Amino acid sequence: DQTRILNVFDQIPPQLSRDNKKFQLSKVASGARFKDYRGCIEWLKDAGIVNVCYCLNFPELPLKGNYDETKYKLYFADTGLLVAMLDEEAQVDLRANKNLGVYKGALYENIVGEALVKSGCGLYYYKRDDSTLEEDFFVRTANNLVPVEVKATNSKSKSLSTLINSEKYSDITYGLKLINGNVGCVNNIYTFPYFCAFLVKKYLSQRK
């Protein structure tokens, strides 16, 4: 109903601000269950308000059918909505590109998620409960699964390297990292500036 939809909507910014961005219904209402809120999330998605990013059971092809519909992140379909829901001081800081704090990673991830959806990609992520291995997004090509990492800082990408180099993930041979920097490639990790996110699918389709 309307109240539940609004409660989910209002919870998106604070939940994106956390390190673990998996959407938790327990933060929406005490005792909330997925089956009771499934319709609310579907309504927000169908209305073009949110993009749902599902957690893969395992990082391998195919993507469809290989995810847990009860584990997901919610991003805004328009990053402007996320910015508009920040407090006034945070909006001023954003325009000045300073003091972004906990929302820095959320903003970059939301921008990339929005760009991927608008270029025709579905949204999937991976996080193992029993380890630190996690990846922000995955995009598929005809023969490969490509992990996409969004870095708010130009730090090392341990999970991305593990996915590329481990024999356990045979569908993954290279990865993409979106950063505040230039185009490059080191150890099968291709880096692109954030603003190139909308070109990811086109780049992968043309890559030999």
Feature names for model-found ranges:
Residues A84, S157-K158, G184-N188:
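Switch/connector loops and helix/strand junctions flanking conserved nucleotide-binding motifs
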Residues A90, I164-E167:
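Short, solvent-exposed amphipathic alpha-helical segments in soluble enzyme
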Residues N154-L163:
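Active-site-adjacent loop/helix micro-motif of nuclease/hydrolase catalytic cores
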Residues R128, S170-Y190:
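Nucleic-acid nuclease catalytic cores
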Residues L145-S155:
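Active-site ExK catalytic segment of metal-dependent nucleases
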Residues G181-K208:
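Domain-level recognition of nuclease-like catalytic cores that cleave nucleotide substrates
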Residues N51-V52, F76, Y125, E149, ...:
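Structural signal for conserved beta-strand scaffold positions within catalytic alpha/beta enzyme cores
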Residues D1-A142:
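Accessory nucleic acid-recognition modules appended to NTPase machines
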